[in-house]
Amino acid sequence: MELADIRREYTKGGLRRKDLKADPIDQFNLWLEQAIKAGLTDPTAMTVATVDENGMPFQRIVLLKNVDKDGFVFYTNLGSRKAQHLEHNSNISLHFPWHPLERQVHITGVAEKLTAMENMKYFTSRPKDSQLAAIASKQSSRISARGVLEGKFLELKQKFAKGEIPMPTFWGGFRVKPQSIEFWQGGEHRLHDRFLFSQHDGEWDIDRLAP
């Protein structure tokens, strides 16, 4: 089969302005709740796009860990490629692809580092093995073999068999403060529904976009 022949119709219904909440964070939370209830695999998984100092874009899948009126939160190794990019350019884009619901959400904004207290609160809530993995992996660095990583993990597991695991200084989170949030709902005959929330002077404007 030719790739150009792979297609389907979008039949799960449209999206109208009257259906939208006035605040896009409330609308996002509604859609996220529906994605979770629908049993989607990894409903909190999002594509995170950053740009390096040469203007080259990079993307990767990261899990959303919190969302509130202040923005969208994720955690990472602060020496990772994404974190280094954000040091040079704090502009960022998030994308949630909820394919089974024929929905997408696209967010643009600016990333800010979380406080040490916020980082510690989440780190201590993680499973112990996840805490150890955060210490063992120098994210995005080159390693000779997987065995090196596994050996470091086992070494740390023995070292911290008892007691609390200290949060590494090279680990932390970012809060993405949104500047725009677009909601996309698939429609029949490729007449999809798109609504863009844009923030101006602390208020959200809503525009319908052509598909």
From Swiss-Prot:
Catalysed reactions listed for this entry: pyridoxamine 5'-phosphate + O2 + H2O = pyridoxal 5'-phosphate + H2O2 + NH4(+); pyridoxine 5'-phosphate + O2 = pyridoxal 5'-phosphate + H2O2
Flavoprotein among keywords: yes
Enzyme's top EC category: oxidoreductase
Binding residue positions for FMN: 60-65, 75-76, 81-82, 104, 139-140, 184, 194
Molecular-function annotations in GO: FMN binding; pyridoxamine phosphate oxidase activity
Keyword set, alphabetical order: Flavoprotein, FMN, Oxidoreductase, Pyridoxine biosynthesis
PROSITE patterns from the UniProt entry: PYRIDOX_OXIDASE (PS01064)
Co-factor note (free text): Binds 1 FMN per subunit.
Enzyme Commission number(s) from the entry: 1.4.3.5
One GO BP annotation of this record: pyridoxine biosynthetic process
Domain of life according to the entry: Bacteria
Pathway entry: Cofactor metabolism; pyridoxal 5'-phosphate salvage; pyridoxal 5'-phosphate from pyridoxamine 5'-phosphate: step 1/1; Cofactor metabolism; pyridoxal 5'-phosphate salvage; pyridoxal 5'-phosphate from pyridoxine 5'-phosphate: step 1/1
Essential cofactor(s): FMN
SUPFAM superfamilies found in the cross-reference section: FMN-binding split barrel (SSF50475)
Chain sites annotated for binding substrate: 7-10, 65, 122, 126, 130, 190-192
One Pfam family recorded for the sequence: PNPOx_N
UniProt xrefs under InterPro entries: Pyridox_Oxase (IPR000659), Pyridox_Oxase_CS (IPR019740), Pyridox_Oxase_N (IPR011576), Pyridoxamine_oxidase_dimer_C (IPR019576), Split_barrel_FMN-bd (IPR012349)
The family this protein is said to belong to: Belongs to the pyridoxamine 5'-phosphate oxidase family.
Subunit structure and binding partners: Homodimer.
Protein function: Catalyzes the oxidation of either pyridoxine 5'-phosphate (PNP) or pyridoxamine 5'-phosphate (PMP) into pyridoxal 5'-phosphate (PLP).
Name of this chain's protein: Pyridoxine/pyridoxamine 5'-phosphate oxidase
Lineage of origin: Bacteria, Pseudomonadati, Pseudomonadota, Gammaproteobacteria, Vibrionales
